[in-house]
């Protein structure tokens, strides 16, 4: 007993010296209730992907990678995240390494262009230095880097076209992420990197696909989303969009390998009401009787949503209050409701 007290006393003195030398919070007891906080997130803009992440969105203070083939919806997901961050009153930045941002499309997705910070860097070092400065400022909530493949090292740009520059980009990413990872956690910002897929030559077994920029991003990313283009969405004979299949291949804040299916309409982005209809039916929030669909409100009133899926989607677009109520009910089922979203529900019940 005396030995345990002595150990405790020595430990307390050691902790005190560490805090004096390195500042308060440099070391802490994990079980201390004042230190353990629920994971804060920025919503993805898709309720299906919010559910798949397990925490309701992209975790703050972490690095996220969204990767997939060309035209699979990576930039669209990143822009939706920016729109969600801005809705929460946050500051967002877009590092356009590809020099391909379409402002009109971004605006259609709900991005406030007047408050969006944008940079079109000349080379990879400049892009990552800008990211580091924004993170260290502590006032930027979301930073999107589009894309890792376009982060060309300065030496490669200044060299001749045929010069062999082995591993330059991988070394650049490794060095930058070592700097950024620590400051991201303190700033509570989310840094999203979009990335492209390349083929490994000579692979006989397993997947030949890999992402650009070396292995560093795979290690430092808390969450990695694999995005794949699915079947086309048609209105009559016209193709108006496509299904996007998302798989959470890495997740440090919730169980990984969950999948989600979302729907992107060309020129408009993710169709929220289309998602609500499909998830609502799957979760029993929306009931079906024959070809008609119904929803029972929090007040106990049964509302007819329409006959056939397309009419239900149109009804939800025209009645945003019911759409929001259905969304809250779905999120509640998965335990994803934030405190700010619980208040309207309580108000409805009290009335």
UniProtKB/Swiss-Prot annotation:
What SMART domains does its record include? AAA
Pfam families in the record, alphabetically? RecA, RecA_C
Molecular-function GO terms, alphabetical = ATP binding; ATP hydrolysis activity; ATP-dependent DNA damage sensor activity; damaged DNA binding; single-stranded DNA binding
Which CDD domains would you find in this protein's record?
RecA
Q: From its record, what is one biological process in GO terms?
A: DNA repair
Q: Which UniProt keywords apply?
A: ATP-binding, Cytoplasm, DNA damage, DNA recombination, DNA repair, DNA-binding, Nucleotide-binding, SOS response
UniProt GO cellular component terms? cytosol
Places the protein is found: Cytoplasm
Is-annotated flag, keyword Lyase?
A: no
Q: Where does ATP bind?
A: 68-75
Q: Which family would the database say this protein is a member of?
A: Belongs to the RecA family.
Question: What does this gene product do?
Answer: Can catalyze the hydrolysis of ATP in the presence of single-stranded DNA, the ATP-dependent uptake of single-stranded DNA by duplex DNA, and the ATP-dependent hybridization of homologous single-stranded DNAs. It interacts with LexA causing its activation and leading to its autocatalytic cleavage.
List the protein's name: Protein RecA
């Amino acid at each position: 007993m005396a030995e345990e007290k002595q150990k405790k006393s020595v430990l307390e003195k050691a902790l005190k010296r560490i805090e004096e030398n390195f500042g308060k919070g440099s070391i802490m007891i994990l079980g201390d209730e004042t230190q353990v906080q629920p994971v804060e997130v920025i919503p993805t803009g898709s309720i299906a992907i919010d559910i798949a992440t397990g925490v309701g969105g992209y975790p703050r203070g972490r690095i996220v990678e969204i990767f997939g083939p060309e035209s699979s919806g990576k930039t669209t997901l990143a822009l939706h995240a920016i729109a969600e961050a801005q809705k929460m009153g946050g500051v967002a930045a877009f590092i356009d390494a590809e020099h391909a941002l379409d402002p009109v499309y971004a605006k259609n997705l709900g991005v406030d262009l007047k408050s969006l910070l944008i940079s079109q860097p000349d080379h990879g070092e400049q892009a990552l230095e800008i990211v580091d400065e924004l993170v260290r400022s502590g006032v930027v909530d979301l930073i999107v880097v589009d894309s890792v493949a376009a982060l060309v090292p300065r030496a490669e740009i200044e060299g001749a076209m045929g010069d062999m520059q082995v591993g330059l980009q991988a070394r650049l990413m490794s060095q930058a992420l070592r700097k950024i990872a620590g400051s991201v956690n303190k700033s509570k910002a989310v840094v999203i990197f979009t990335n492209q897929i390349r083929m490994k030559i000579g692979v006989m077994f397993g997947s030949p696909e890999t992402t650009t920029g070396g292995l560093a991003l795979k290690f430092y990313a808390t969450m990695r989303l694999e995005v794949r283009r699915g079947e086309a969405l048609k209105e009559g004979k016209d193709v108006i969009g496509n299904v996007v299949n998302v798989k959470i291949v890495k997740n440090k804040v919730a169980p990984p390998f969950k999948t989600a299916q979302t729907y992107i309409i060309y020129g408009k982005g993710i169709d929220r009401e289309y998602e609500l209809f499909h998830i609502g039916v799957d979760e029993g929030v929306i009931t079906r009787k024959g070809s008609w669909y119904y929803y029972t409100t929090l007040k106990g009133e049964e509302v007819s949503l329409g006959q056939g899926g397309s009419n239900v989607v149109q009804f939800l677009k025209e009645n945003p209050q019911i759409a929001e109520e259905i969304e809250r009910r779905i999120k509640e089922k998965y335990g994803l409701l934030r405190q700010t979203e619980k208040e309207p529900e309580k108000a409805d019940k009290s009335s």
